[in-house]
């Protein structure tokens, strides 16, 4: 498959302080090179602090807060990892609701490393196959999802990966899914039924 064009597509990057720098910067670069219009969305305005593991690195300017946006404003959602970043996001009702809006509207979502924690919190993991940083596998399973140890997993428009080493494969699948666009709409209740039916 050739290079994916995201010209005319608008992508929200949902992140908070303590995001893993490489997991935001490299996918953002891939999105930018594909022609996407990108906005950093966070739980507060100003800047958010990036980290290389536990070492503070660069800050990123926030374009909009979660209170100012909805899934209707974007074509796709990307959530970078880092331990503190998704932990803050999943504790913020507006951030969780935004992720849920993307999922129920069928718009593609990409999440790497610890970011699937936010998918768990939003009820998006239920009935889906995901990967993540390995320590999240129990959380994914307890939320009704199936966890697998693969560099990248795509389940109906949801792209997940485990760690920074997976970024090349993650970026490729993210661009493919974001270019494909909206998948079938479904609500969280339907996802719950899908899991019950599979049991």
Regions found by a protein language model. Give the residues of each.
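Extended, subdomain-level signal for the structured scaffold at the beginning of enzyme domains
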Residues: 1-105, 109, 117-129, 137-199
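Catalytic nucleophile serine of serine hydrolases
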Residues: 113
């Amino acid at each position: 498959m050739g290079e994916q064009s995201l010209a005319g597509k608008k992508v929200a990057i949902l992140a908070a302080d303590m995001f893993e720098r490489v997991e935001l910067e490299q996918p953002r670069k891939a999105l930018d090179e594909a022609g996407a219009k990108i906005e950093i969305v966070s739980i507060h305005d100003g800047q958010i602090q990036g980290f290389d593991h536990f070492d503070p690195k660069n800050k990123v300017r926030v374009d909009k807060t979660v209170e100012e946006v909805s899934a209707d404003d974007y074509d796709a959602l990307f959530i970078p990892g880092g331990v503190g970043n998704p932990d803050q996001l999943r504790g913020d009702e507006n951030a969780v609701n935004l992720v849920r809006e993307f999922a129920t509207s069928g718009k593609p979502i990409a999440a790497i490393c610890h970011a699937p924690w936010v998918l768990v919190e939003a009820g998006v993991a239920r009935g889906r196959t995901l990967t993540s940083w390995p320590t999240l596998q129990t959380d994914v399973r307890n939320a009704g999802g199936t966890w697998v140890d693969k560099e990248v997993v795509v389940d109906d428009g949801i792209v997940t990966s485990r760690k920074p080493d997976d970024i090349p494969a993650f970026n490729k699948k993210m661009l493919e899914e974001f270019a494909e666009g909206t998948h079938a709409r479904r609500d969280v209740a339907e996802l719950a039924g899908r899991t019950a039916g599979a049991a």
